[in-house]
């Protein structure tokens, strides 16, 4: 009994370390509890910061489920105790004591705990998530489908009815956390997974045409500021040589006129000198 309580406490406290909030604070990202879907999980961090931060949070969340289960198996706990340790880690992720009981939805932590509990079950759940997400592009639908099948995968592969209740409780908690997503899926308002590097990049990509689109709504607007500046620079560069050529031509004409005028003025002078002699 003492081992059971100890493992439950360890699982809950490790699950309460919310990696999404820590990663966002460390790298200066928005608070996932206040921005995006307002869920401090890997998918929301993916939307807010990019793929690298989303993967980082996903790995940390999975480790929160892996480490307590490995500890329980290392201490030779019974399979039921190991399953309840996994449940405690998921509950800690959903309702963390360190972050005012506002946590994530527990999908990555559940998959990590299942990988440590029974590797094949964890692989099957992860493969189900990837297949559903690949075909329908809904993270919530993939989570609901994969976690819902976890207890039945355990019955098929393990065949131990004692581990079914804690795994079924994990499924109920995950479904409860996804209740809003479930309603949005029915209404067709659930956002799909977008593999953008950052939400800021989406804003920057759309920003150059916003002012022009407001002035000319309903029309395609092309940004020609760069082309116009290039044209003006080229025009100025072309005009400058023409002015120089014109000045050189004027100088040549004046010099020719001076040369033609000079002989006319000198010839009469020579004649007058000879006549005097």
Curated annotation (Swiss-Prot):
Primary localization: membrane
Biased composition (Basic residues): 240-253, 262-271
Entry GO terms, CC: plasma membrane
Family annotation (SMART domains): G3P_acyltransf (SM01207)
Reactions mediated catalytically: an acyl phosphate + sn-glycerol 3-phosphate = a 1-acyl-sn-glycero-3-phosphate + phosphate
UniProt-annotated stretches for the region Disordered: 207-277
Membrane-protein topology: Multi-pass membrane protein
UniProtKB keywords: Cell inner membrane, Cell membrane, Lipid biosynthesis, Lipid metabolism, Membrane, Phospholipid biosynthesis, Phospholipid metabolism, Transferase, Transmembrane, Transmembrane helix
Biased composition range(s): Basic and acidic residues: 216-239
Membrane-spanning segments: 3-23, 55-75, 79-99, 111-131, 155-175
NCBIfam families found in the cross-reference section: glycerol-3-phosphate 1-O-acyltransferase PlsY
Function: Catalyzes the transfer of an acyl group from acyl-phosphate (acyl-PO(4)) to glycerol-3-phosphate (G3P) to form lysophosphatidic acid (LPA). This enzyme utilizes acyl-phosphate as fatty acyl donor, but not acyl-CoA or acyl-ACP.
Family recorded in the similarity comment: Belongs to the PlsY family.
UniProt subunit comment: Probably interacts with PlsX.
Name under which the protein is recorded: Glycerol-3-phosphate acyltransferase
Organism: Legionella pneumophila subsp. pneumophila (strain Philadelphia 1 / ATCC 33152 / DSM 7513)
Designated gene of the protein: plsY
């Amino acid at each position: 009994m003492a081992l059971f309580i100890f493992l439950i406490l360890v699982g809950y406290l490790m699950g309460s370390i919310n990696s999404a909030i820590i990663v966002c604070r460390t790298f200066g990202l928005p608070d996932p509890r206040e921005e995006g879907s307002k869920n401090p999980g890997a998918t929301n961090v993916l939307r807010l910061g990019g793929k690298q931060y989303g993967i980082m949070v996903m790995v940390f969340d999975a480790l929160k489920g892996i480490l307590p289960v490995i500890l329980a198996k290392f201490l030779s706990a019974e399979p039921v105790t190991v399953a309840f340790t996994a449940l405690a880690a998921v509950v800690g992720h959903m309702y963390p004591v360190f972050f005012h009981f506002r946590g994530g939805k527990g999908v990555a932590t559940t998959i990590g705990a299942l990988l440590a509990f029974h590797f094949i079950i964890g692989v099957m759940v992860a493969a189900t998530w990837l297949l559903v997400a690949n075909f329908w592009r809904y993270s919530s639908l993939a989570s609901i489908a994969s976690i819902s099948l976890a207890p039945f995968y355990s019955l098929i592969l393990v065949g131990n009815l004692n581990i079914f209740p804690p795994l079924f409780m994990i499924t109920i908690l995950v479904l409860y956390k996804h209740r809003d997503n479930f309603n949005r899926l029915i209404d067709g308002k659930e956002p799909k997974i977008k593999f953008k590097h950052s939400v800021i990049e989406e804003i920057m990509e759309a920003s150059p045409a916003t002012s022009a689109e407001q002035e000319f709504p309903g029309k395609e607007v092309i940004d020609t500021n760069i082309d116009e500046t290039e044209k003006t620079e080229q025009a100025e560069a072309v005009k400058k040589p023409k002015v120089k050529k014109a000045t050189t031509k004027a100088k040549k004409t004046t010099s020719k006129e001076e040369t033609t005028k000079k002989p006319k003025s000198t010839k009469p002078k020579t004649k007058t000198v000879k006549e005097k002699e």
